[in-house]
């Protein structure tokens, strides 16, 4: 699972989603990409499951770039705990995704293989996604 080695603060505020992605919304590394169409907190487990799905589908040919990183900790209180007594301990890590953000890029494979790999991988994600290519960007 992806997680930061160290952070400035252990327990960040929850925040909220406003607007669309102004950064990370262009294809930089590969030829084809998977783009988010909805706002979401992507967990490190979801990112890893999607990565494994794509690499297995393309049979480890080409190159895959992960364009998101889970750098926000989500805290959780233990079950059957009374309210109060401070904020819970960090439980898992998420990446904050806005609409239009590029999640994954792939290169060195055909367009049909990349499309099918990303279509298969999108079932691992809790949001609607779109397949885009560099030539039509």
Curated annotation (Swiss-Prot):
GO terms for cellular component: chloroplast; mitochondrial large ribosomal subunit. It comes from the Eukaryota. GO terms for molecular function: rRNA binding; structural constituent of ribosome. SUPFAM superfamilies: Ribosomal protein L16p/L10e. It holds the Pfam family Ribosomal_L16. Keywords: Chloroplast, Plastid, Ribonucleoprotein, Ribosomal protein. Its main location: plastid. It is found in: Plastid, Chloroplast. GO terms for biological process: mitochondrial translation. InterPro entries: Ribosomal_uL16 (IPR047873), Ribosomal_uL16_bact-type (IPR000114), Ribosomal_uL16_CS (IPR020798), Ribosomal_uL16_dom (IPR016180), Ribosomal_uL16_sf (IPR036920). Part of the 50S ribosomal subunit. NCBIfam families: rplP_bact. Belongs to the universal ribosomal protein uL16 family. This is Large ribosomal subunit protein uL16c. It comes from Rhodomonas salina.
